[in-house]
Amino acid sequence: MNVFWGLVALVGGIVFLVGANSNDASQVWSIYLVNLVFWSGLAATGPAIAGMMQVTEARWSPSVRRIALTTAGFLPVAFVLFLVLFAGQTVLYPWVTKPIPSKAAWLNPPFFWLRTWLCAVVLFAVCFAFVRALLRDAIPPEDGRERARRNRIAVILLTVWLVTVSLWGFDLIMSLDPKWYSGLFGGYFAVSTLYTAFCLLSIFTIRANARGRASMPPAAVQDEAKLQFAMSILWMYFFWSQYIVIWYGNVPVETRFFVERVFVQPWMTLAWVVLIVGWLIPFAYLLKRLTGRPPQRHAPLVVVAIFGLVAIFLERVFVVFPSVSPSARLPFGPLLYGFMENARNADPARQVIMTG
């Protein structure tokens, strides 16, 4: 099976190299960027969630913390992907070949790549330091020094995570269209990444329970569902806050971004799919689930979590593609391949970190 997936990855790499040097280079690099920001965000946010649980000292979270840490296994791959992105800068970012004088202090290649790679190195290093600290033996109740040390690392991790992921939103995504800007976009990107991470955590937790690798009572799974519900609302709140301010401001350089995506096909259809699959369906189901006793069956929660993951992945497509290749059709084949290949690499069963 490993040989098979190795061959699949090899074929995918060859196809990517051919496509990156063809007339469809803009689509190929757009697909690459979508997968990069989606999966790298998930990989870094798992340890961040564990950091939140460490700082708050949630009593139900020790097993969940170890499961959340498994996403860190993808971080080395993510860093390599960040390095490869440099090769596509002239295709993705117009300001590389046509500098914008008013934004040149921030949007210039040396500074752009320095902060992108430096932030990634710092974030990934802190993630691994936190993973290493948490995977040690359990802290004795009287060992306040070790608990304080872990809390300090967790606070540093959360700070670095918020700054870095917000910068990914501003730099890697928003600068694809350097004339458009939104002060909320970095926060929106961080919140949507956090939403996907809670969706993934729900799936991993239920799967670990089913395989006997963790023992989580229904009430603990219900707590995860509450967090997933809260993040879905916060995600939509950030989107609506951003949308309504730009729409009522009616400044062409700002409204153009939404007009191209919400009122032009095929992006208009995709926008409705993201709204319904990523928010309306999860909101309706989770609202019903959270108003009663914790159910014993968790399959519907897994389905809703998958909906959330797929919706945010499509939202990344919705944001990236019109900026790079607005006339392109949706390349579902390559997108599906990239999604499945990265999902396989991010599978906790393939990571070194054990959840048992």
Enumerate the predicted regions with their spans.
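Membrane-interface transmembrane-helix boundary segments in multi-pass integral membrane proteins
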Residues: 185-189, 253-276, 297, 328-356
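Hydrophobic alpha-helical membrane-insertion segments
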Residues: 72-87, 230-239, 303-315
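Transmembrane-helix bundle segments that line or gate the permeation/cavity pathway
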Residues: 29, 36-139, 157
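A cytosolic-side transmembrane-helix exit/cap motif
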Residues: 53-55, 204, 319-328
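N-terminal ordered "arm"
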Residues: 5-16, 20-22, 27-47
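Extended, compositionally biased non-globular segments
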Residues: 263-323
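Generic alpha-helical transmembrane segments
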Residues: 38-45, 195-196, 273-279
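Long, contiguous internal "core" modules enriched in hydrophobic/ aromatic residues
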Residues: 1-22, 106-274, 285-291
